[in-house]
């Protein structure tokens, strides 16, 4: 019994759910149908009829009449056929939805959408075309009078200033006639109701008059350039060229007379372009001619600056070469003198020869350049380039010569410094011997004495090299450095030994107070004294220090610090 009840409840619940779903779908279908009905009403409300009435106010002939008939037919078809079909489809869709025939309702709605879409698009096209026609009429009416004023003013200006246009006047008159014909065609198109065609004519007038206005403004200026400004500048250029040649300038390389003839021909082609109203081509040619003319003027100016440079720099270079020549002769003599006393390296001798050779080359080049200037067969700009190069090489040669001269002076300076160094080393040895005598040492270790002897011999060898003629400073400096290292080492080692010996004496003196109390100590101190007398100061220090440290730890450090303070004070 319970199971049957459960089944009944499930079945009833399912039926209710299905019913609710169908009700929801139906409500949604109703909403879609209502939206389509609203769209249909919006289409009906579009002001096609009102716009068509506006067209009737125009000249109903020609193009306007033809378009009006087409739009009327389209509108009648939409109202009589397409929209009723859509309305019938929507009624069917509502009926099917109420009967829960949703598939049929959907199909009917799609048919309605198709018809409404077609109607909407066709109406939009009609309205756009209507608007284009009406706007064309309105714009034409608003703009044509302004264009007539522009044309009249242009015509008056050309007639009043026809002398400013020269041979181009005829072409301008022809173009004005072309624009005048457009006004006639505009009136005809408007009278025939061809408003769209009239619109095209208005736009053509705007473009044509704008172009013509630009030409009318540019032609006078271009004619002035071609007939007055540029010819005068070309004549001035030619006169300037001839005047400069009389003043001694060499200008054949510029070929200015030929350039002037070529540019004069170009001016004639520009005049032809202006006559034919090829304004862009004429303007480009004139700009090219101006650039070409400026370049030629710049080249003449370059020659003027070059001549001034040559006149100023020639004197400077001449003086520089004379100075270098005199200094080179002095340096050559100084080199011969130095070679008698010093041994020069091959590279140093070669440097002097190179300087002398370069000097002769520069003097020869300068001499040839002066001849060319006197013969007046070369442009000053070319002379300037050659003179600049000679001047730069003179400056370089000055530097090389100064360096070579400094090298010669340095050799003498090196000899003087070497002798000073030897005297310094001699003083170091004397000071070392004085310290030994003052310290009352019994003598120095054999190794130091041998090193001292070696240092003295090295110094003697340097003295010997300094007496040789020619003097080889490279060898002198090398052996001098070696001798100084030996003597300096001997001096430092001797000072260390003296300090070490003094410390040994102090340690032995300190240990003597314990000598009678400790036989081992006495023996060690005696041994230290023996080593001291045999100049074995390292061994003596080690012997005395070790025995005292055993007896009194730290005493050696204290005595060493005392000795250091005593020697530095």
Curated annotation (Swiss-Prot):
The parts of the chain that form a coiled coil are 103-149, 273-336, 383-440
Principal subcellular localisation of the protein = membrane
Regions of this protein lying in the Cytoplasmic compartment: 26-569
A GO-annotated cellular component = plasma membrane
Membrane topology classification: Single-pass membrane protein
Per the record, ranges on the Extracellular side are 1-6
Looking at the UniProt entry, the stretches that span the membrane are 7-25
Sorted alphabetically, which Pfam families does this protein's record hold?
EzrA
Q: Tell whether Cell cycle is among the UniProt keywords.
A: yes
- Report the domain of life of the source organism: Bacteria
Q: Where's it found, cell-wise?
A: Cell membrane
Family the entry assigns:
Belongs to the EzrA family.
Identification of the protein by name: Septation ring formation regulator EzrA
Instruction: Please report the organism this UniProt entry assigns to the protein.
Output: Bacillus cytotoxicus (strain DSM 22905 / CIP 110041 / 391-98 / NVH 391-98)
